[in-house]
Amino acid sequence: MAKVPDLFEDLKNCYSENEDYSSEIDHLSLTQKSFYDASYDPLPEDCMDTFMSLSTSETSKTSKLNFKESVVLVAANGKTLKKRRLSLNQFITNDDLEAIANDPEEGIIRPRSVHYNFQSNTKYNFMRIVNHQCTLNDALNQSVIRDTSGQYLATAALNNLDDAVKFDMGAYTSEEDSQLPVTLRISKTRLFVSAQNEDEPVLLKEMPDTPKTIKDETNLLFFWERHGSKNYFKSVAHPKLFIATKQGKLVHMARGQPSITDFQILDNQF
């Protein structure tokens, strides 16, 4: 009868061969303790209360670390407070090192120096127009209008809503978001509302047509949130900011009060 191969013995031999290979390459003892169990010699006084980078072979003298190095926070008495492996093969900033000290959880650090847009590859696909030629009124019953320059939006108390800006709301969908992203286009034009930074007026951006897919132009997208008769438009590009109004100001982006962030949607809906 043929002998059944001993898989555990094969794995053991495989690990043994890998250990020998690793020893030749790294010149490290295979019996040494892991990074988390490692102990370190006392540090000189000028290294106390500072961030240091320790690799398996030498101490790094720069704050630019790669994934092969480890970060250690040392207290004034020389006691090691925190140790962590970095998993991203790229440079990180001093702010990232500061986060290690302030973060009570042990885990992977995502460098804050990486811009939001580079951390997400979300694509938003156009579905359909959900509101056609609608008017937006704020809590002061002021309607959204074009300002005199035509480049921005403002608000005014109107007797005739025909003078208010009419919007077409285009709904989008993505695999990652449970909310409803929409665009706000001025009806019968190619002008789309585009979010800006906090307290800056929204812009009217001209596009060739309604985008079928939005990936990089997320300033054009807003999460439409409805609470009863109140409607909120939260920026996809700046998730803490909402389309807002304020007496004497252009329509702008704000977190909340003293600006008004809720609107009523009037006119045709389908």
Swiss-Prot record:
Q: Give one Pfam family.
A: IL1
Q: Which Gene3D superfamilies match?
A: 2.80.10.50
Q: Where is this region: Nuclear localization signal (NLS)?
A: 82-86
Q: Which positions carry the propeptide annotation?
A: 1-112
Sites where Phosphoserine occurs are at: 87
Keyword Transcription found: no
Q: Which GO terms describe its cellular component?
A: cytosol; extracellular space; nucleus
Q: What family is this?
A: Belongs to the IL-1 family.
Domain comment in the entry: The similarity among the IL-1 precursors suggests that the amino ends of these proteins serve some as yet undefined function.
Q: How does it assemble?
A: Monomer. Interacts with TMED10; the interaction mediates the translocation from the cytoplasm into the ERGIC (endoplasmic reticulum-Golgi intermediate compartment) and thereby secretion. Interacts with IL1R1. Interacts with S100A13; this interaction is the first step in the export of IL1A, followed by direct translocation of this complex across the plasma membrane.
Protein name as annotated? Interleukin-1 alpha
What is the species of this protein? Equus caballus (Horse)
Q: Which gene encodes it?
A: IL1A
